[in-house]
Amino acid sequence: MLTHKQLELLDFIQKRMARDGVPPSFDEMKDALDLRSKSGIHRLITALEERGFIRRMAHRARALEIVKLPESMERAAEAERGLQTQPAFTPMLIAGSRTEPPRGALPVAAAALDIPMMGRIAAGVPIEAIAEVAHHVTVPGAMLSGRGEHYALEVKGDSMIQAGINDGDIVVIRSQPTAENGDIVVALVEDLEATLKRYYRRGGMIALEAANPAYETRLLREDQVKVQGRLVGLIRSY
């Protein structure tokens, strides 16, 4: 699973290598992704290498090699080369017998909805934002706050434990670009990292506050933070 920026960089590298036969320079990558510094490119390259999509080769200039592409990008590349791709597998569904629920069962399933599980979100030190659907999870319809898109994330870390959010919990997020003071939000920091924190406006700055005294509040400029959604529910497995 890759972030939007990781996908954008991998796509840029793949297209440039197909055209020129060599990878682009770090300056070209920085300009293509509209990043302020090459350090962001280094982090994206490292993430792509750790996930097995590219390989850095020692003692060679512009030493990058594409090992594999995500399925969606591979199909696009094959289409550009004029190759016919195989249709996606469609499973055959067999209807089973319908049984009555056990006595005393809560009528949750009847009002349950599937929402996309988008991967992990940091409740601690920010980790890479996830922008691809991993799978879907079923949640009670009453948990979804009115209209709008919703998605789920697995919590990684302990910075929100005093808000009742533990490592391994599944949080349900309503997708929205704004937040009120005190909301627990998914915040995208500098288009590279995502974190789950309480949101506060302080003058011209944004404070991302943990619910654990072991973590410091982060103060960032408004242009460094994008709200990706607001917490509306939580699922915990025992």
From Swiss-Prot:
Disulfide bonds: none
InterPro entries: LexA, LexA-like, LexA/Signal_pep-like_sf, LexA_DNA-bd_dom, LexA_repressor, Peptidase_S24_LexA, Peptidase_S24_S26A/B/C, WH-like_DNA-bd_sf
Alphabetical GO biological process terms: DNA repair; DNA replication; negative regulation of DNA-templated transcription; proteolysis; SOS response
Active-site residues (renumbered): S159 (for autocatalytic cleavage activity), K197 (for autocatalytic cleavage activity)
Site (Cleavage): A123, G124
Domain of life: Bacteria
Sorted UniProt keywords: Autocatalytic cleavage, DNA damage, DNA repair, DNA replication, DNA-binding, Hydrolase, Repressor, SOS response, Transcription, Transcription regulation
Reactions catalysed, as given in the entry: Hydrolysis of Ala-|-Gly bond in repressor LexA
Enzyme class: hydrolase
Gene3D superfamilies, alphabetized: Umud Fragment, subunit A (2.10.109.10), Winged helix-like DNA-binding domain superfamily/Winged helix DNA-binding domain (1.10.10.10)
Keyword rRNA processing: no
Molecular function as annotated in GO: DNA binding; serine-type endopeptidase activity
Residue ranges: DNA binding: 26-46
UniProt EC number: 3.4.21.88
Record SUPFAM superfamilies: LexA/Signal peptidase, Winged helix' DNA-binding domain
Described function: Represses a number of genes involved in the response to DNA damage (SOS response), including recA and lexA. In the presence of single-stranded DNA, RecA interacts with LexA causing an autocatalytic cleavage which disrupts the DNA-binding part of LexA, leading to derepression of the SOS regulon and eventually DNA repair.
Quaternary structure, from the entry: Homodimer.
UniProt name for this protein: LexA repressor
